């Protein structure tokens, strides 16, 4: 598929870059071109995973990767698809010392027709560009990068598992590669993309609900920070809190914010509450994109689907623990769930908050909405339902 043709299809789907990231210094006009893509096929292909064995997330990688280098003097170099290999970095590399790094997560699915399709990848490209500009990393043409990624997936498409629930995880990364201990705008950068076949998050379609630790002493993101960008520095500090949750018998963390203990995210997922609101109206609510919430691709997809159905109110609004617990006590909460690329939709059945366990009746209610979202997403992602969200490889 020619890049020019793809550009006409995708341009209307991209969101505008925030005005404060559009200065001339940050928003360079140069970019690499998919037409210049170089291809070096591996001479030592890896053994593909046994389809009968479970695939652990992020442990297996395909034969090839995409690499593009950038420096301030010459701009972007030629993109190349090359054999999967280790990186060589200077010990003073700015990504290692000052977290000048960002990443994306997206998936390719193989349908019953054996065709491989990417799920809403232009949204990932938009989010990746916003993250790059926030870190003063080089700009790039979203459509050119997307075409390079499509070509990479095409080269390694035999690695895409074919059973329901499995997929090929696509991990684009952009890092500052400045060989200096000074903190500043990097003059070198490296963009690379690796691929990993992954198994079903819920084997056999059996949804497993999770319990959450809600501790307001831990904060994931704050107003004026970078919680709405997909940066590596947002994830490392959450590991300790995740361990604390596990020590208390919880699988995930419910991140709270502010004096009112606003619900923000679940682990690395966006959070949704399906309930009857105080005015008696059935609604699906998720926190708004106010600067501390990551604009998840699946989050947006669930909102889009629910609004298309038009069967209940769909809102983006702040949710406090006080109003949530009041609704729980009144029996107005139907389902609570997280959404993300890894799990798609993950049910929640319990919250540990201020020393008390609160049961959420998600599973007792079907969970009808979660199952409906799962069914609809699978139909779209695996090609049984034609949809503009999917990009054929």
Curated annotation (Swiss-Prot):
Entry's Gene Ontology BP terms: L-leucine biosynthetic process; L-valine biosynthetic process; lipid metabolic process
Cofactor dependency: pyridoxal 5'-phosphate
Gene3D superfamilies xref list: 3.30.470.10, D-amino Acid Aminotransferase, subunit A, domain 2 (3.20.10.10)
MF terms (GO), sorted A to Z: branched-chain-amino-acid transaminase activity; L-isoleucine-2-oxoglutarate transaminase activity; L-leucine-2-oxoglutarate transaminase activity; L-valine-2-oxoglutarate transaminase activity
Main subcellular localisation: mitochondrion
Statement: the UniProt record of this protein carries the keyword Transmembrane helix: no
Family from the record: Belongs to the class-IV pyridoxal-phosphate-dependent aminotransferase family.
Pfam families found in the cross-reference section: Aminotran_4
Cellular component GO terms, alphabetical: mitochondrion
EC number: 2.6.1.42
Subcellular location per the Swiss-Prot or TrEMBL entry: Mitochondrion
Residues given in the record as substrate binding sites: 169
UniProt superkingdom: Eukaryota
PANTHER family tied to this protein: BRANCHED-CHAIN-AMINO-ACID AMINOTRANSFERASE, MITOCHONDRIAL (PTHR11825:SF39), SUBGROUP IIII AMINOTRANSFERASE (PTHR11825)
Record protein name field: Branched-chain-amino-acid aminotransferase, mitochondrial
InterPro entries on file: Aminotrans_IV, Aminotrans_IV_CS, Aminotransferase-like, B_amino_transII, BCAT-like_C, BCAT-like_N, BCAT_family
N6-(pyridoxal phosphate)lysine modifications at: 230
Entry keyword set: Acetylation, Amino-acid biosynthesis, Aminotransferase, Branched-chain amino acid biosynthesis, Lipid metabolism, Mitochondrion, Pyridoxal phosphate, Transferase, Transit peptide
N6-acetyllysine carried by residues: 322
Subunit text: Homodimer.
Organism this protein belongs to: Bos taurus
Taxonomic placement: Eukaryota, Metazoa, Chordata, Craniata, Vertebrata
Catalytic reaction annotation: L-leucine + 2-oxoglutarate = 4-methyl-2-oxopentanoate + L-glutamate; L-isoleucine + 2-oxoglutarate = (S)-3-methyl-2-oxopentanoate + L-glutamate; L-valine + 2-oxoglutarate = 3-methyl-2-oxobutanoate + L-glutamate
Functional note: Catalyzes the first reaction in the catabolism of the essential branched chain amino acids leucine, isoleucine, and valine. May also function as a transporter of branched chain alpha-keto acids.
Transit peptide as recorded in UniProt: 1-27
